[in-house]
């Protein structure tokens, strides 16, 4: 179906080009009278052959035998096309003065051909005459011989019975259907300088064209025109540019017309708008012209770079719309008055002045460094020097806080105090953990009171009951889950006190809970497995000799909590007299074999509780040393011999009703089993 449509379109195109129908075939045979017998005397016969427009006639002879005479004066066949005689033929073979057709083929110069046969009054021999055949054939108008005129300027397309012309891109076919006129109007040039030329320069410019070139610069510029290389525009010796001409128009005057072969002089237009028109006629073969245009304007004063800065680009002169930017050296910033600038560019105006004053390059000032919580800052470069490359030193309060980095900061080019690792934030003073003045010895049940600085991590929890906890950071407290059960929603009833030895002392550091986290595996009233909790404080507490966190156990801590290894526990719990201790008491107690402890509680079960892998036991087989009610949540601590710091290994959880009884060991939550849980809560709060 698509093929039929295409064939139909092609047929429509050809029919349009040739007319409403194909031309009738034109062909035939011509012979002399009596052929192939001899022809008679006094014979005159003419044939006028006609072909359709766009065709020509082709004729050749298959037999030719005429009387030979000087210049074919007696008998002859004459071929005529229009007014031109193509050939006069006689004889059988050509001589110096006579021509016989032989194997030649003859073509008409147009669509018609006249054939004339003539014989005189006598023939000495019998001559048999001629036989010729003719036919019409399409003329390829696009094929031209050397020296013939070309029918089309650019492209020639032949078809049966005719031809048509087309043009290259940038040209349009003139209404004469042969000439390609240039599309060269409406061109606009806005650059300060440039070149423009006639179409195809330096080749001959097109005929029948009208070109317009517009140079449009901003007000304040003056355009100058220089004709360069060569100039060749058709002229007339007696008239001023009647054929092809070049004219130049400004808002003030007109220049030209120009033609001929002499370069026109420089034209200083004193205008920012110039229109150049170029018109050509239908004849001639000239190469055209080329113009280099430039522009000038009132210059601005040469800019001067500020100290510690430079200007770019650097030019010999700066005129209208020229610009420059100011850049400061590293460590300096652009300042216009007191206003800092991200960048600066000035533009030359038409009156010869810059649109903005040049700024200064002021040294970067990082400003006073922020105060460091639990630390201080020292100026290294000089007293209160805070400008580019100045150095400061942050330090933590000695003994109680430590810093992981070296604390040295430099004022950098971006205006920020920056550490050697590229950090912009303040260093952190982390509390020192596990420092104590405690030495082994003493008891809770029959033990000794603690001295100031022995257990600075000890926390007193007051509410409906008395309990304890251990400070593990300056805003986190570790305790037993059962000690704070029910406090997750009623946190206001939880009174947290630190830095005291006497339970009823009026001098203490007060803290309030922000959040309470009880281990998700703890079930109140169903034993003490996972008896661990964290309290997030609303505010950080200040670390000092009497308030300091206990360390969390290292991975190697298990080797320090083996059976018979001694730990220490402190608290205000019940003493042997059955009353809560007024002073903070402590005792050193050994670790008990886990299986031995579990077996002991199987014999003397604590109601609803059993010893699990999440617990450890401590105490003496004979009794006498133990924690008791009121000590819940307190820390069972051990000394790390390698670091010489104390760490929390257990949390006071549960035990026999008879504290310190024979084979009635204290049971503690095993902290090493909960390090990931503790770190996850703290890191994600």
UniProtKB/Swiss-Prot annotation:
Keyword Calcium among record annotations:
yes
Query: Which EC class, in a word?
Result: hydrolase
The protein's matches in SUPFAM superfamilies, at most eight in alphabetical order, are given as:
Complement control module/SCR domain, EGF/Laminin, Spermadhesin, CUB domain, Trypsin-like serine proteases
- Provide the glycosylation site positions: 103, 285, 641
InterPro entries with a match to the protein in the record: CUB_dom, EGF-like_Ca-bd_dom, EGF-like_dom, EGF_Ca-bd_CS, NOTCH1_EGF-like, Pept_S1A_C1r/C1S/mannan-bd, Peptidase_S1_PA, Peptidase_S1_PA_chymotrypsin
Where is the site Cleavage?
443-444
| PTM per Swiss-Prot/TrEMBL | N-glycosylated.
Where is each Peptidase S1 domain found?
Answer: 444-683
Swiss-Prot/TrEMBL GO biological process terms:
complement activation; complement activation, classical pathway; complement activation, lectin pathway; proteolysis
Query: In what residue span(s) does the Sushi domain sit?
Result: 298-363, 364-431
Tissues where this protein is expressed: Highly expressed in liver. Secreted in plasma.
Molecular function via GO: calcium ion binding; calcium-dependent protein binding; complement component C4b binding; peptidase activity; serine-type endopeptidase activity
Glycoprotein among keywords: yes
Q: Which residues carry this modification: (3R)-3-hydroxyasparagine?
A: 158
Record-listed E.C. numbers: 3.4.21.104
Write out the residues that bind Ca(2+) 2: 138-139, 159, 162
Q: What is its main location?
A: secreted
- Top-level taxon of origin: Eukaryota
Give the intrachain disulfide bonds.
Answer: 72-90, 152-165, 167-180, 184-211, 241-259, 300-348, 328-361, 366-411, 396-429, 433-551, 597-617, 628-659
Q: What interactions and quaternary structure are annotated?
A: Homodimer; disulfide-linked. Binds MBL2. Isoform 2 binds to MASP1. Binds SERPING1.
Q: Which family does it belong to?
A: Belongs to the peptidase S1 family.
Q: What does this protein do?
A: Serum protease that plays an important role in the activation of the complement system via mannose-binding lectin. After activation by auto-catalytic cleavage it cleaves C2 and C4, leading to their activation and to the formation of C3 convertase.
Name-wise, this protein is Mannan-binding lectin serine protease 2
User: What organism is listed for this UniProt entry?
Assistant: Rattus norvegicus
């Amino acid at each position: 179906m698509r093929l039929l449509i295409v064939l139909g379109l092609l047929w429509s195109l050809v029919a349009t080009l040739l007319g409403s129908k194909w031309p009738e075939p034109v062909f035939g045979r011509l012979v002399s009278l009596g052929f192939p017998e001899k022809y008679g005397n006094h014979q005159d016969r003419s044939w006028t052959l006609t072909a359709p427009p766009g065709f020509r006639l082709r004729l050749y002879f298959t037999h030719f035998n005429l009387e030979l005479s000087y210049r074919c004066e007696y008998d002859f066949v004459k071929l005529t096309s229009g007014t031109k005689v193509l050939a006069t033929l006689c004889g059988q073979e050509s001589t110096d003065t006579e021509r016989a057709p032989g194997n030649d083929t003859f073509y008409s110069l147009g669509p018609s051909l006249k054939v004339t046969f003539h014989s005189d009054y006598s023939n000495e021999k019998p001559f048999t005459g001629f036989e010729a055949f003719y036919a019409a054939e399409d003329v390829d108008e696009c094929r031209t011989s050397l020296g013939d005129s070309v029918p089309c300027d650019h492209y020639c397309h032949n078809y049966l019975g005719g031809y048509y012309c087309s043009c290259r891109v940038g040209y349009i076919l003139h209404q004469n259907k042969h000439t390609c006129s240039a599309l060269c109007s409406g061109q606009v040039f806005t650059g300060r300088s440039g070149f423009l030329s006639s179409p195809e320069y330096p080749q001959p410019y097109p005929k029948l064209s009208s070109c317009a070139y517009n140079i449009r610069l901003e007000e304040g510029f003056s355009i100058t025109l220089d004709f360069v290389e060569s100039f060749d525009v058709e002229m007339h010796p007696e008239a001023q540019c009647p054929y092809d001409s070049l004219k130049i128009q400004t808002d003030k005057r007109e220049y030209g017309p120009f033609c001929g072969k002499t370069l026109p002089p420089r034209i200083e237009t004193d205008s920012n708008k110039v229109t150049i028109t170029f018109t050509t006629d239908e004849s001639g073969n000239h190469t055209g012209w080329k113009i280099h245009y430039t522009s000038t304007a009132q210059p601005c004063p040469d800019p001067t770079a500020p100290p510690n800065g430079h200007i770019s680009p650097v030019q010999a002169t700066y005129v209208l719309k020229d610009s420059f930017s100011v850049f400061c050296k590293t460590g300096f910033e652009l300042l216009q008055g007191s206003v800092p600038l991200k960048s600066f560019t000035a533009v030359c105006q038409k009156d010869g002045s810059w649109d903005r004053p040049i700024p200064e390059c002021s040294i970067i000032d990082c400003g006073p460094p922020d105060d460091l919580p639990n630390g201080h800052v020292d100026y290294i470069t000089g007293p209160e020097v805070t400008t580019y490359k100045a150095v400061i030193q942050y330090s933590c309060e000695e003994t109680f806080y430590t810093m992981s980095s070296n604390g040295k900061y430099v004022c950098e080019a971006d205006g920020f105090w920056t550490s050697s690792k590229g950090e912009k934030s303040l260093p952190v003073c982390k509390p020192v953990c596990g420092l104590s003045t405690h030495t082994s010895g003493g008891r809770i049940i029959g033990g000794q009171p603690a001295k100031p600085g022995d257990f600075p991590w000890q926390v007193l929890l007051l509410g409906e009951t008395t309990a304890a906890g251990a400070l593990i950071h300056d805003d986190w407290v570790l305790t037993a889950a059962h000690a704070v059960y029910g406090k997750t929603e009623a946190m206001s009833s939880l009174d947290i006190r630190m830095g005291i030895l006497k339970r009823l002392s009026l001098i203490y550091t007060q803290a309030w809970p922000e959040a309470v986290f009880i281990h998700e595996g703890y079930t109140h009233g169903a034993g003490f497995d996972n008896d661990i909790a964290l309290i997030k404080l609303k505010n950080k507490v200040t670390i000092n000799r009497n308030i300091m966190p206990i360390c969390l156990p290292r991975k190697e801590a298990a080797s320090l909590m083996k059976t018979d290894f001694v730990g220490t526990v402190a608290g205000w719990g019940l003493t042997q007299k059955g009353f809560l201790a007024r002073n903070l008491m402590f005792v050193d107690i050994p670790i008990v074999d886990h299986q031995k402890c579990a077996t002991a509680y199987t014999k003397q079960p604590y109601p609803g509780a059993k010893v699990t892998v999440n617990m450890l036991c401590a105490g003496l087989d004979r009794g006498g040393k133990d924690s008791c009610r009121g000590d819940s949540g307190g820390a069972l601590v051990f000394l790390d011999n390698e670091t010489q710091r104390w760490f929390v290994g257990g949390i006071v959880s549960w035990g026999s009703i008879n504290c310190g009884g024979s084979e009635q060991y204290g049971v503690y939550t095993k902290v090493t089993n909960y390090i990931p849980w503790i770190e996850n809560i703290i890191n994600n709060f």
